[in-house]
């Protein structure tokens, strides 16, 4: 059974691989405004670091703390090179991983948490739901990073869950991963299905 902790581990891995891929472009390309939600590669990655920090240290601990301003206004006077951005991402990942080890049980994930909507509405939910929100935020922004890389004719790292978690990058698939039944040869036709007669 896949948990939100597994999904957070997955987005950590994606975030790190996408960061390293984008970092090879050089600082100028890494910080160039590309017209996406957070403007540049740099700001997207730092935004995700602040988002995770807020979820893990505040919301998942049940503290209805308003969003820190840095979530939307990434400081320009800090993280002024690739090394500093990488360090920030690794610090946040280490902080998250430490908590995720403790939270990786159904009981811990079911504990009460909070999520602050529109800066002023604290919503009651479970720790699991708060982490699910953090996962979706990551996937949305990493999709932007993937699109920016494609626009620059840079092949992004694979985002396939199956490849990363089931096959562990092995291709063709090992025999142990293959389905034992027959492969369907016909694809169902699109269109409306007739209701069954009773």
Give residue ranges: language-model regions:
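Active-site rim elements
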Residues: 1-7, 82-86, 131-135
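Short, contiguous alpha-helical
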Residues: 8-20, 27-73, 116-181
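Short secondary-structure junctions
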Residues: 24-26, 103-104
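Acidic catalytic patch
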Residues: 102-119
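Short Lys/Arg-rich cationic patches that frequently serve as NLS/NoLS or arginine-rich RNA/DNA-binding motifs
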Residues: 189-198
């Amino acid at each position: 059974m896949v948990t939100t902790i597994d999904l957070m581990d997955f987005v950590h891995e994606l975030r790190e691989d996408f960061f390293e891929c984008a970092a090879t472009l050089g600082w100028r390309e890494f910080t160039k405004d590309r017209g996406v939600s957070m403007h540049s590669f740099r700001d997207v990655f730092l935004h995700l670091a602040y988002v995770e920090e807020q979820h893990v240290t505040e919301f998942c601990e049940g503290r209805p703390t308003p969003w820190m301003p840095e979530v939307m206004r990434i400081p320009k006077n800090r993280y002024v090179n690739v090394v500093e951005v990488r360090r920030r991402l690794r610090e946040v990942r280490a902080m998250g991983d430490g908590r995720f080890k403790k939270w990786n049980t159904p009981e811990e994930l079911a504990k009460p948490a909070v999520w602050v909507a529109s800066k002023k509405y604290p919503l009651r939910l479970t720790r699991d739901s708060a982490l699910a929100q953090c996962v979706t935020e990551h996937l949305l922004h990493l999709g932007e990073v993937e699109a920016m890389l494609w626009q620059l004719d840079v092949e992004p790292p694979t985002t396939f869950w199956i490849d990363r978690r089931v096959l562990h990058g092995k291709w063709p698939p090992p025999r142990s991963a293959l389905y034992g039944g027959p492969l369907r040869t016909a694809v169902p036709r699109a269109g409306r299905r007739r209701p069954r007669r009773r």
